[in-house]
């Protein structure tokens, strides 16, 4: 992971934080706790986000995080704090797909958007929840 990231990437997708964190713990055969692995990952993300890699590229990380059965965020408060934004994809009771931000340090629209994946190779945005489209 360290070697690959050192090349410098515009965007890196992590699916999921828990899987990567557990892989690091497993690789270190018991001498690294889950909390320490999370700290290592967050420090690595921050380093590359600041462009501290061979290409001096400011890397954006899109990190998929699991939720509890109740739909609550399943990570640590430090993880939540270190993120620039937190987006959610959920189903409505009517079966529609939604996308919204609960945190966005860069500002912007925080409304709940409806979308469809019916068209091949294209996301169909269908309006904003609660607003006529």
Predicted regions and their residues:
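C-terminal regions of RecA-like/P-loop NTPase motor modules
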Residues: 7-8, 52-60, 92-133
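P-loop NTPase motor core
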Residues: 1-100
């Amino acid at each position: 992971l360290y070697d690959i990231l050192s090349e410098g990437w515009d965007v890196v997708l992590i699916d999921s934080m828990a899987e990567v964190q557990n892989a690091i713990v497993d690789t270190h055969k018991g001498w690294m706790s889950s909390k320490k692995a999370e700290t290592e990952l967050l420090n690595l993300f921050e380093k590359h986000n600041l462009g501290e890699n061979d290409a001096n590229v400011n890397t954006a990380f899109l990190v998929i995080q699991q939720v509890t059965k109740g739909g609550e965020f399943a990570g640590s408060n430090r993880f939540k704090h270190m993120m620039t934004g937190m987006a959610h994809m959920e189903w409505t009771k009517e079966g529609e797909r939604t996308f919204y931000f609960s945190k966005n340090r860069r500002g912007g629209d925080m409304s709940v958007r409806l979308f469809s994946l019916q068209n091949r190779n294209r996301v169909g945005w269908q309006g904003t929840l609660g607003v006529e489209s």
